[in-house]
Design a protein with these regions (language model features):
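Helix-breaking motifs and short loop linkers at transmembrane-helix boundaries and internal kinks
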Residues: 39, 72, 93-99, 127, ...
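Juxtamembrane intracellular "pre-TM" segments in multi-pass secondary transporters
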Residues: 2, 188-224, 249
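Conserved MFS/SLC helix-loop-helix module at the cytosolic interface between two early adjacent transmembrane helices
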Residues: 59-95
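Cytoplasmic membrane-interface "Motif A"-like loop-to-helix N-cap segments
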Residues: 70-80, 282-298
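Cytoplasmic helix-loop-helix junction between adjacent transmembrane helices
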Residues: 103-142
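Extracytoplasmic gate region of multi-pass secondary transporters
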Residues: 28, 220-269, 273-274, 334, ...
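Extracellular/periplasmic helix-loop-helix junction of adjacent transmembrane segments
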Residues: 30-59
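Helix-loop-helix hairpin linking two adjacent transmembrane segments in secondary transporters
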Residues: 138-188
């Protein structure tokens, strides 16, 4: 496999990842318009942007992973892109909550094929030393996609409207099926036939489930790490309401709200996503400490700005800084956070551990909290409270900050373990030196 072909395949998957995240967040970017046109409650909107998509996406992920392992992963993702692109186009014809709900759920099924299939292909065709870079760049496409969703809604929503953009996005997705099926799938098939990178023997499904269950029961560190990781993902859920919040309670025009948030997201997320992992590694090496302390410092520095955002008026610097913090807080520490949590999982079941972690974040947190914020906002509105969405989002922000004590406990525990093991390691080093 030549470097040119590998680069072409990577760029193709990178672009598909961008398309997937645009599709995932375009509904949120047009929140106020879709809520008004389809006569949705905020609870229903929270279901569409959260649980309806996320639950199906997370539950389908393990199944798609098995299919990608047993069959040609390029063909699996081609079918997935075909399904989600068609459903995206159909979403543009929705006339009610239920006619939007069904295609959004099927979009989740289709998009669940991408990451397992891409992981299968990239792992087989890349060396260990380059995988971190490859996956960091690949997941960067998600940040680009989120920002582009809001930018597209703000820039072209007024002229094209949300229905036409959904149809256009679905059409673009369908075009990617052609090179996937005709170019990537044959290359994957030939690579498997020549056994350039033979598969390693894997434990049985029963053994994997048993090991994962044992990890959950026996490892307090793993449970707290997953809890902290999941709590930070509450910010993903609250950010689903950003366009709706900016337009309904901060006075921005619908398309201006989407455009402003899209511009901020792109400006902050790309450099933050690229530099966060590098800064974490430098911090750990320089201070000889843990990743968890880095996470605590980042969350402590940006958390108060997030809380202040909900109460700042739109013409103040505090509002602008808070808006930046809402993006920075999830994108800058994400690489270090994921690496820290996955290090709590034994190497033999890291793929299954990753699946469980993402399931917990997507279904229990992003899906559940998105629905909860919408329902709470509706309740506050019925009681006559002012700024009901701001109040509901503030509760979500407070939940995000509960990750800080989780990461602090993990830092203290890991530091104590290092202090216990370091003298033993030093003694062993001295003994080896004397023998020499």
């Amino acid at each position: 496999m030549t470097n040119l072909k590998l680069t072409t395949i990577f760029v193709l998957f990178f672009c598909i990842n961008i398309i997937g995240f645009i599709d995932r967040h375009l509904l949120s970017a047009f929140g106020s318009q879709i809520v008004a046109e389809l006569d949705l409650t905020r609870q229903q909107f929270g279901l569409l942007t959260g649980f309806a998509f996320v639950a199906v996406y997370a539950l389908s992920g393990p199944v798609m992973g098995v299919l990608a392992d047993r069959h040609n992963p390029a063909k699996v993702v081609t079918v997935g892109v075909l399904v989600w692109s068609l459903m995206t186009a159909i979403s543009g014809r929705a006339t009610s909550f239920f006619t939007m709900l069904a295609p959004r759920m099927l979009v989740g099924v289709g998009e669940a094929t991408l990451h397992p299939s891409a992981t299968s292909i990239f792992t087989k065709w890349s060396g260990v030393g380059s995988r971190s870079t490859i996956f960091s760049l690949f997941f960067l496409g998600g940040h680009v996609g989120v920002g582009l969703a809001y930018w597209l809604a703000g820039t072209f929503g007024d002229t094209l409207g949300w229905r036409q953009l959904f149809l256009l996005l679905g059409s673009v997705g369908l075009l990617f099926c052609i090179p996937l099926w005709l170019f990537v799938a044959p290359l994957v098939a030939r690579s498997n036939q020549t056994n350039d990178k033979p598969l390693v023997s894997r434990p049985s499904v029963t053994q994997i489930v048993s090991d994962l269950r044992h990890l959950l029961v026996s490892s307090t560190r793993f449970r707290i790490a997953v809890l902290g990781f999941a709590l930070v993902h509450v910010l993903y859920a609250t950010n689903q309401f950003m366009q709706l919040w900016l337009s309904s309670e901060r006075g921005l025009a619908d398309y201006e709200a989407a455009s402003v948030y899209g511009a901020v997201y792109l400006t902050v997320a790309i450099p933050a996503g690229l530099l966060g992992g590098l800064m974490a590694d430098l911090f750990i090496r320089y201070f000889r400490t843990t990743k968890y302390l880095f996470l605590v410092i980042v969350l402590l520095a940006s958390g108060p700005l997030l809380i202040a955002l909900r109460y700042a008026t739109i013409d103040t610097p505090l509002f602008q800084i808070g808006l930046v913090a809402s993006v920075f807080m999830i994108t800058f520490p994400y690489g270090a956070m994921f690496a820290a949590v996955i290090e709590e999982v034994p190497a033999r079941i890291q793929a299954s551990g990753t699946g469980f972690i993402l399931f917990a974040c997507n279904v229990l947190v992003i899906g559940g909290v998105t629905w909860g914020v919408g329902a709470l906002s509706d309740y506050f509105q019925t009681t006559g409270l002012t700024q009901p969405l701001s109040r509901a989002l503030s509760i979500g922000d407070a939940m995000t900050l509960l990750a800080i004590p989780c990461f602090w406990w993990l830092h203290r525990h890991q530091t104590q373990m290092m202090q216990i093991t370091q003298p033993a390691n030093d003694a062993m080093t001295d003994s080896n030196s004397e023998q020499k």
